[in-house]
């Protein structure tokens, strides 16, 4: 999860987020090399006496600065497209959960069970227990099995929302009248926090998301109690 004065991304918990972190590092290195080259050229221009000021044409230089950016864009685009296709894949999900955004809370329905659904509201600051996180705790967590593919069906009942959990690499728009889908798989147990990431009204900041990833045996016990 996030911490105060954090500069980097959250620790990855899913394979998709691992890929996103690698892509971030890959792109950042390219940006660093380009920035270094530009700063080097600027320093040369400031410290070196200019020559060939009357030159009006340089075919070789123009060829290089046309081809080189194209190669750089390809090096960025190919891994990006690979990750985009990975994020759109739905690989035989073991469980499906329908998420509906409201002003200003989330409701969840486990579609593989007959009567397993609930609303999830933020716990007000004055009701928090010691150690709980302000603006992030909810009264009903979304309990899911770890190391299993879970499909999330996401929609909205009123205005645009966005269901996002950074450590899992998830961010999907909740649009009224439309059902979007995404998949998640957590590689380790724990609590993973997210928030609505689309401005949806005055209480937009009070729509947290809490996923509790647990072993399959614990999930089966929890679902039996809830049903």
From Swiss-Prot:
The entry's localization annotation reads: Mitochondrion inner membrane
* Enzyme class label: translocase
Q: Where are the transmembrane segments?
A: 15-45, 60-87
List positions binding Cu cation A1. Answer: 161, 196, 200, 207
As cofactor, the record names: Cu cation
* Annotated coiled-coil segments of the chain: none
Asked if Mitochondrion is a keyword of the record, the answer is: yes
Q: List residues binding Mg(2+).
A: 198
| Mitochondrial matrix side of membrane | 46-59
Instruction: Quote the EC number.
Output: 7.1.1.9
Family matches, as Gene3D superfamilies: 1.10.287.90, Cupredoxins - blue copper proteins
- Its predominant location is mitochondrion
Q: How does it sit in the membrane?
A: Multi-pass membrane protein
Q: Which InterPro entries would you find in this protein's record?
A: CcO_II, CcO_II-like_C, CcO_II_C, Copper_CuA, Cupredoxin, Cyt_c_oxidase_su2, Cyt_c_oxidase_su2_TM_dom, Cyt_c_oxidase_su2_TM_sf
**Keyword terms, alphabetized:** Copper, Electron transport, Magnesium, Membrane, Metal-binding, Mitochondrion, Mitochondrion inner membrane, Phosphoprotein, Respiratory chain, Translocase, Transmembrane, Transmembrane helix, Transport
Question: Which SUPFAM superfamilies does the UniProt record give?
Answer: Cupredoxins, Cytochrome c oxidase subunit II-like, transmembrane region
- Which residues get modified to Phosphotyrosine? 218
Q: Which family does it belong to?
A: Belongs to the cytochrome c oxidase subunit 2 family.
Q: What does this protein do?
A: Component of the cytochrome c oxidase, the last enzyme in the mitochondrial electron transport chain which drives oxidative phosphorylation. The respiratory chain contains 3 multisubunit complexes succinate dehydrogenase (complex II, CII), ubiquinol-cytochrome c oxidoreductase (cytochrome b-c1 complex, complex III, CIII) and cytochrome c oxidase (complex IV, CIV), that cooperate to transfer electrons derived from NADH and succinate to molecular oxygen, creating an electrochemical gradient over the inner membrane that drives transmembrane transport and the ATP synthase.
The annotated subunit structure for this chain is: Component of the cytochrome c oxidase (complex IV, CIV), a multisubunit enzyme composed of 14 subunits. The complex is composed of a catalytic core of 3 subunits MT-CO1, MT-CO2 and MT-CO3, encoded in the mitochondrial DNA, and 11 supernumerary subunits COX4I, COX5A, COX5B, COX6A, COX6B, COX6C, COX7A, COX7B, COX7C, COX8 and NDUFA4, which are encoded in the nuclear genome.
Please identify the protein, giving its name as recorded: Cytochrome c oxidase subunit 2
What is the originating organism of this protein?
Lycalopex sechurae (Sechuran desert fox)
What is the name of the gene encoding this protein?
MT-CO2
């Amino acid at each position: 999860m996030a911490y105060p004065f954090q500069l980097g991304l959250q620790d990855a918990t899913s394979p998709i987020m691992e890929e996103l972190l690698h892509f971030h590092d890959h792109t950042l290195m390219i940006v660093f090399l380009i920035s270094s080259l530009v700063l080097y050229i600027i320093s040369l221009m400031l410290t070196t006496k200019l020559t060939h000021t009357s030159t009006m044409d340089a075919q070789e230089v123009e060829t290089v600065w046309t081809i080189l950016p194209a190669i750089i864009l390809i090096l960025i685009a190919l891994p990006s497209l690979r990750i985009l296709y990975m994020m759109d894949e739905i690989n035989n999900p073991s469980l499906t959960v329908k998420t509906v955004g409201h002003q200003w809370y989330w409701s969840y329905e486990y579609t593989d069970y007959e009567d397993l659904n609930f609303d999830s509201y933020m716990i007000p600051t004055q009701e928090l227990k010691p150690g709980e996180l302000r603006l992030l705790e909810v009264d009903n967590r979304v309990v899911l099995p770890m190391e299993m593919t879970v499909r999330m069906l996401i929609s909205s009942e009123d205005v645009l929302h966005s269901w996002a959990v950074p450590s899992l690499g998830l961010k999907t728009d909740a649009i009224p009248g439309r059902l979007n889908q995404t998949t998640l798989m957590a590689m380790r147990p724990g609590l993973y926090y997210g928030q609505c990431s689309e401005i949806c009204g005055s209480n937009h900041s009070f729509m947290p998301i809490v996923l509790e990833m647990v072993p399959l045996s614990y999930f089966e016990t929890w679902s039996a109690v809830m049903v």
